[in-house]
Amino acid sequence: MIPKLLKHELTFPHPNDATEDGIVAWGGDLNPSRLIRAYQNGIFPWYGKNDPIIWWSPNPRLIMELDDFKLSRSLRKSMKKFEYRFDTNFINVMKNCQNIKRVKQDGTWIQDEIIEAYSVLHDMGIAHSVESYLDGELVGGLYGVAVGGLFCGESMFTLVNDASKSAYAVLINHLKIWGYDFIDAQVPTEHLKNLGAKEVSRDYFLDRLHKVNMNIINHKWELLHVNT
């Protein structure tokens, strides 16, 4: 039986007790303390409309080593046409991720309550957005959660070819500079594998998670990065 979380308790079952599909628990709420505790333990929420909150720790897990990102010549060229900003348009990035149509996906897992909850994390300097602009218009980007030296990528969107991949490349460059260890890409996808991400076991991921640099201070990333 999948454990149910109570709203007054912030503890989670151990990820290794997850179901074969990677479900750790269900229920609870999305208050900041619970979300932070979840990410610190390699767990994240992911659920559909009208479903209860479901907490996951998949096995295998997809991660991106910062030095493994594959920056093709064509992407390097595309990157030069965009302007990049950090943490200046967080809610609109989330809303675009919510509304973008995706292949083989009916509807979105990004509910309005998810946007509200992660906006609170953003105000706390824990959730971040990377944004690509073309002629002053937001055309792509991504958002995620920082846990010490780990960045947990949540979702990305693109309205113009290569806009989200370019934002991802800019993110990786800055994570290296800031002393981050790696990116948690969560659920394996061919798109991110093609960019250099790899599947690892849950045990390996949790071991890496517990060794990340926890001296990185949470703060807003309000930077302006003009072209590349």
Swiss-Prot record:
GO molecular function: leucyl-tRNA--protein transferase activity
Keyword Acyltransferase: yes
One Pfam family from the record: Leu_Phe_trans
EC number(s) from the headed UniProt entry: 2.3.2.6
Location in the cell: Cytoplasm
Keyword annotations: Acyltransferase, Cytoplasm, Transferase
InterPro entries reported for this sequence: Acyl_CoA_acyltransferase, Leu/Phe-tRNA_Trfase, Leu/Phe-tRNA_Trfase_C, Leu/Phe-tRNA_Trfase_N
Gene name for this UniProt entry: aat
Bridged cysteine pairs (disulfide): none
Function: Functions in the N-end rule pathway of protein degradation where it conjugates Leu, Phe and, less efficiently, Met from aminoacyl-tRNAs to the N-termini of proteins containing an N-terminal arginine or lysine.
Protein name, entry field: Leucyl/phenylalanyl-tRNA--protein transferase
Enzyme class: transferase
GO terms under biological process: protein catabolic process
Taxonomic classification: Bacteria, Pseudomonadati, Campylobacterota, Epsilonproteobacteria, Campylobacterales
Signal peptide location: none
Keyword Cytoplasm tagged: yes
Assigned protein family: Belongs to the L/F-transferase family.
GO (cellular component) term, any one: cytoplasm
Enzymatic reactions: N-terminal L-lysyl-[protein] + L-leucyl-tRNA(Leu) = N-terminal L-leucyl-L-lysyl-[protein] + tRNA(Leu) + H(+); N-terminal L-arginyl-[protein] + L-leucyl-tRNA(Leu) = N-terminal L-leucyl-L-arginyl-[protein] + tRNA(Leu) + H(+); L-phenylalanyl-tRNA(Phe) + an N-terminal L-alpha-aminoacyl-[protein] = an N-terminal L-phenylalanyl-L-alpha-aminoacyl-[protein] + tRNA(Phe)
Organism the protein comes from: Sulfurimonas denitrificans (strain ATCC 33889 / DSM 1251)
